[in-house]
From Swiss-Prot:
Pfam families: p450
Activity regulation behaviour: Both 17alpha-hydroxylation and 17,20 lyase activities are significantly stimulated by the presence of cytochrome b5.
Top-level taxon: Eukaryota
Name listed for the protein in its UniProt record: Steroid 17-alpha-hydroxylase/17,20 lyase
Coiled coil: none
EC number, as in UniProt: 1.14.14.19, 1.14.14.32
SUPFAM superfamilies named in the record: Cytochrome P450
Residues the entry annotates as binding heme: 441
Pathway where this protein functions: Steroid hormone biosynthesis; Steroid biosynthesis; glucocorticoid biosynthesis
GO biological process: androgen biosynthetic process; glucocorticoid biosynthetic process; hormone biosynthetic process; progesterone metabolic process; steroid metabolic process
Cofactor: heme
Taxonomic source organism: Mus musculus
Keywords: Endoplasmic reticulum, Heme, Iron, Lipid metabolism, Lyase, Membrane, Metal-binding, Microsome, Monooxygenase, Oxidoreductase, Steroidogenesis
């Protein structure tokens, strides 16, 4: 009997293990696996997935494979191999696996974040970049960020001497920036629509952060599934909210004055319908559904990520007040209190920029990048990678590699400064906070400006210290789609030098 069982397992393994068209091809070393269930029984049950994958490198090396059900996934944990996937062979690995949960979120592969590699994806991505170019004219983007950062500071000013959790205020400020970019609309802090946007954004991130077997075994979707129902509910609320803003944009649309991502997408749709592009573009890729999913992707990619990093920066500064004081010393010296810090001040506020870079290293926005998919039979290093193989870049491994980083688990902003402290450096190529290549973060330039300007304004005006209850922020984090930090409070104190400067201005 056991001989028959063994034979059956071997037969199943033969049919389910990927085949290569290249004779004698060498595959990445694999975790053990069983037919149908794959390597699931052999994966660690506890701990964060990115850390577990990193730990497995000790046994299997910087690139290895595993089976998720009947799907092959390759885990990449070294910068040279990661850059090969993302940049050198970026087009070959620019595909996206189609999963049940992501299919619900992207209306079956529309948009830019979760869409598979296609001409439609490339076109929408190009138009999103065009939007950011639009806002770079006359420093519109920087002025908008400064306006929201100033509004945030005005709200925090009312909490002088108190211990508060600032995450909601920060979240709403970032929402307003994204709403302006997407729809040329902004809201007052108490407007209920901001709470609605925060609720569905956090809800989607939370649900996607729970691994669901339905993405490994799609046939399970025929059974009741709480996570799928929650995704449907949050997506429904998101669509209703975005449609309301979208309709307002259509009413105000003026082809002579494009002012938002939605305007650019509407104009592209009109050009395609009138065949004004000269490229024979299919107007159907600009349906309202396509436009709304692309805008929804920008909401998802641009809100939770930036607000989360701002919270992480505050938390690390509370843990490391000497770093905070160094940043404030630079601000006092090079900016003072008579003007608002600008993005150009990066050349002088080196410790602030180094701190931002270090936070993006030690707590990457996404410890595991969204999975890629091989569009063709390809290779990574010396290993053959068959078409349709899923490829997961373990950014955590790159950013915590002891061979590349000195004391990688220690918060050390100075690692991004030269020995004299007078120039910013990147000490190793093993640093990819925004990914790279065709699937790199679309909003990298926006995020860098937001992080710098928000933190420069906040630290110009306030001290943030351990809360009155003496509870330091927990730095373990909760890695969902975005690496979140647990809620925490900080003691807020308006800086005396800032107060004195305001008195001088008013007299």
């Amino acid at each position: 009997m056991w001989e028959l069982v063994g034979l059956l397992l071997l037969i199943l393994a033969y049919f389910f293990w990927p085949k290569s068209k290249t004779p004698n091809a060498k595959f990445p070393r694999s975790l053990p696996f069983l037919p149908l269930v794959g390597s699931l029984p052999f994966l660690p049950r506890r701990g964060h997935m990115h850390a577990n994958f990193f730990k497995l490198q000790e046994k299997y090396g910087p690139i290895y494979s595993l089976r998720l059900g009947t799907t092959t996934a390759v885990i990449v944990g070294h910068y040279q191999l990661a850059r090969e996937v993302l940049v050198k062979k970026g087009k070959e690995f620019s595909g996206r696996p189609q999963m049940v949960t992501l299919g619900l979120l992207s209306d079956q592969g529309k948009g830019v974040a979760f869409a598979d590699s296609s001409s439609s994806w490339q076109l929408h991505r190009k138009l999103v970049f065009s939007t950011f170019s639009l806002f770079r004219d006359d420093q519109k983007l920087e002025k908008m960020i400064c306006q929201e950062a100033n509004s945030l500071c005005d709200l925090i000013l009312t909490y002088d001497g108190e211990s508060r959790d600032l995450s909601t205020l920060i979240f709403k400020s970032v929402i307003n920036i994204i709403c302006t970019i997407c729809f040329n609309i902004s809201f007052e802090n108490k407007d209920p629509i901001l709470t609605t946007i925060q609720t569905f954004t956090e809800g989607i991130v939370d649900v996607l952060g729970h691994s669901d077997l339905v993405d490994i075994f799609p046939w399970l979707k025929i059974f009741p599934n709480k996570n799928l129902e929650m995704i449907k509910e949050h997506t429904k609320i998101r669509e209703k909210t975005l449609v309301e803003m979208f309709e307002k944009c259509k009413e105000k649309f003026n082809s002579e004055s494009l002012s938002s991502l939605t305007d650019i997408l509407i104009q592209a749709k009109m050009n395609a319908e009138n065949n004004n592009t000269g490229e024979g573009q299919d107007p159907s890729v600009f349906s309202d559904k396509h436009i709304l999913v692309t805008v929804g992707d920008i909401f998802g990619a641009g809100i939770e990520t930036t607000s989360s990093v701002l919270n992480w920066i505050l938390a690390f500064l509370v843990h490391n007040p000497e770093v905070k004081r160094k940043i404030q010393k630079e601000i006092d010296q090079y900016v003072g209190f008579s003007r608002t810090p600008s993005f150009n001040d990066r050349t002088h506020l080196l410790m602030l920029e180094a701190t931002i870079r270090e936070v993006l290293r030690i707590r990457p926005v996404a410890p595991l990048l969204i999975p890629h998919k091989a569009n063709i039979d390809s290779s990574i290093g010396e290993f053959a990678i068959p078409k349709d193989t899923h490829v997961i870049i373990n950014l955590w491994a790159l950013h915590h590699d002891k061979n590349e980083w000195d004391q990688p688990d220690r918060f050390m902003p100075e690692r991004f400064l030269d020995p004299t402290g007078s120039h910013l450096i990147t000490p190793t190529p093993s640093y990819l906070p925004f990914g790279a290549g065709p699937r790199s973060c679309i909003g990298e330039a926006l995020a860098r400006q937001e992080l710098f300007i928000f933190m420069a304004l906040l630290l110009q005006r306030f001290d943030f210290d351990v809360s009155d209850d003496k509870q330091l922020p927990c730095l373990v984090g909760d890695p969902k789609v975005v690496f979140l930090i647990d809620p925490f409070k900080v003691k807020i104190t308006v800086r005396q030098a800032w107060k004195d400067a305001q008195v001088e201005v008013s007299t």
